[in-house]
Amino acid sequence: MRAATPLQTVDRPKDWYKTMFKQIHMVHKPDDDTDMYNTPYTYNAGLYNSPYSAQSHPAAKTQTYRPLSKSHSDNGTDAFKDASSPVPPPHVPPPVPPLRPRDRSSTEKHDWDPPDRKVDTRKFRSEPRSIFEYEPGKSSILQHERPVTKPQAGRRKV
């Protein structure tokens, strides 16, 4: 694996990302007339590469760049197939788990099940009132939820 040039030392970060992507995904094709270990790579797409540039490694050749395919059939050639490699078995779907007890009989109802009919929630909504009608400790919602019981006048604590 090659050492990458730090992004801070590159003038154009977008070009650096492109170059790194091409170096990572480059497919080496051996040529008959060239030596792959001693051939210098050049990148002649209009970018300036001087010997004094910030890159420590030259860019990859664009002629040899080809995205890696996911399967051998995508390449269109049988050169990469190995006859001794085993063929993976076809995909078998996992078995379906048995139905849960609550799924078996939908006619049984429990206390925690949602109600069959919709509940009118308008009575629980508080309508905005004027600030001048505010009474501390008094709530219209509490009056709807439970009736106010007044203490009996006959009993007094001493």
UniProtKB/Swiss-Prot annotation:
Entry-annotated residues carrying Alanine amide: A153
InterPro entries, per database record: SoHo_dom (IPR003127)
Entry-annotated residues carrying Phosphoserine: S73
Region (Disordered): 28-158
The keyword Cytoplasm appears for this protein: yes
Pfam family, one: Sorb
Assembly notes: Interacts with ABL1/c-Abl, ABL2/v-Abl/Arg, ACTN, AKT1, CBL, PALLD and PAK1. Interacts with ABL, CBL, DNM1, DNM2, FLOT1, AFDN, PTK2B/PYK2, SAPAP, SPTAN1, SYNJ1, SYNJ2, VCL/vinculin, and WASF. Interacts with PTPN12 and WASF1 via its SH3 domains; this interaction may mediate the partial PTPN12 and WASF1 translocation to focal adhesion sites.
Protein name in the entry: Sorbin and SH3 domain-containing protein 2
